[in-house]
């Protein structure tokens, strides 16, 4: 009888482990007493988590995202402030934001996610403190245009550029969604700033450097920032296929002037485009068109 009981327990444990998705790796940015060096280290943690150190594109030293994984799919980023923690969920294969977590005005954890970007089971693994009943699909899409529309920006060109960037602004936007009744406009504005201060800053050291230069103050964004954000795929493709030893085979213009050397782009992370034919040689020698998130 004992043998059958042990076998039954073992079978249940085995089934449970096969049904459960491993929790995502999480990194935390302390916003209670932030510093420029802490922010830079936070971005480096993101890059190091998703990069494949064996991939070298165009003979550069720019980190490259690894091939998509069927098991380790998501990354969790926590913004820890004096009023609590708000979290983002990112897809590791491209750093696209799929969900966020915040407390409501009754101090109940709630997770909000973009349609078709993450399953309920994956969301539970990403944000285990949120019960399934408190998972809610966002009413708008994950692309910048959809989020901007819901942010109801009325100044200038009505794009995210008009909101600015900066750590203090990020803190303000977090306070707008944490322990509050959900307001879609505040939520969308939080997402626009949080995405740019994490995923985009990890992709582009140019953006990171603007944040640290002005740290911790809010500063006006610029057209060049937006051009970088909509050109990640184009830049990655150019470095992957038309760059040798860090030099492009021709001048490239990604919307902010011609460049010939990849280092002038101040890239932080390149999109995964496969393994280049010359990757082994480069390794030895060195011993988007779509506006999406």
Swiss-Prot record:
Root EC class: hydrolase
List of catalytic residues: 200
Glycosylation: residue positions: 284
Signal peptide: 1-23
EC number: 3.2.2.22
Tissue and organ distribution: Expressed in leaves (at protein level).
Flavoprotein listed as a keyword: no
One GO term of the biological process aspect: regulation of defense response to virus
Domain of life: Eukaryota
Catalysed reactions, as listed in the record: Endohydrolysis of the N-glycosidic bond at one specific adenosine on the 28S rRNA
Molecular-function GO terms, alphabetical: rRNA N-glycosylase activity; toxin activity
Subunit structure: Monomer.
Listed PANTHER family: PTHR33453, RIBOSOME-INACTIVATING PROTEIN (PTHR33453:SF34)
Its biological purpose: Single-chain ribosome-inactivating protein.
Protein name (Swiss-Prot/TrEMBL): Ribosome-inactivating protein dianthin-30
Species of origin: Dianthus caryophyllus
């Amino acid at each position: 009888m004992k043998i059958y009981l042990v076998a039954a327990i073992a079978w249940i444990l085995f089934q449970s482990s096969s049904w459960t998705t491993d929790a995502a790796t999480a990194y935390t940015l302390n916003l209670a007493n932030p510093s420029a060096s802490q922010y830079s280290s936070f971005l480096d943690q993101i890059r190091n988590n998703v990069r494949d150190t064996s991939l070298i594109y165009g003979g550069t030293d720019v980190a490259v995202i690894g091939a998509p994984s069927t098991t380790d799919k998501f990354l969790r980023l926590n913004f820890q402030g004096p009023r609590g923690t708000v979290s983002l969920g990112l897809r590791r294969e491209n750093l696209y934001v799929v969900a966020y977590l915040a407390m409501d005005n009754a101090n109940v954890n709630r997770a909000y996610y973009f349609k078709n970007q993450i399953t309920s089971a994956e969301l539970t693994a990403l944000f285990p403190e949120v019960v399934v009943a408190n998972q809610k699909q966002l009413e708008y899409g994950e692309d910048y245009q959809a989020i901007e529309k819901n942010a109801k920006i009325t100044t200038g060109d009505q794009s995210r550029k008009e909101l600015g960037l900066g750590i203090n602004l990020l803190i303000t936007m977090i306070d707008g969604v944490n322990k509050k009744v959900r307001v879609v406009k505040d939520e969308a504005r939080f997402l626009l700033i949080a995405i740019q201060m994490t995923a985009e800053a990890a992709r582009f050291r140019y953006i990171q450097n603007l944040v640290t230069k002005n740290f911790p103050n809010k500063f006006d964004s610029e057209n060049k920032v937006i051009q970088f954000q909509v050109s990640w795929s184009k830049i990655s493709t150019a470095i992957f296929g038309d760059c040798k030893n860090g030099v492009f085979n021709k001048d490239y213009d990604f919307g902010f002037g011609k460049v010939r050397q990849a280092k002038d782009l101040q890239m932080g992370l390149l999109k995964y485009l496969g393994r280049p034919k010359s990757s082994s040689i480069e390794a030895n020698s060195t011993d988007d068109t779509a506006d999406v998130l």
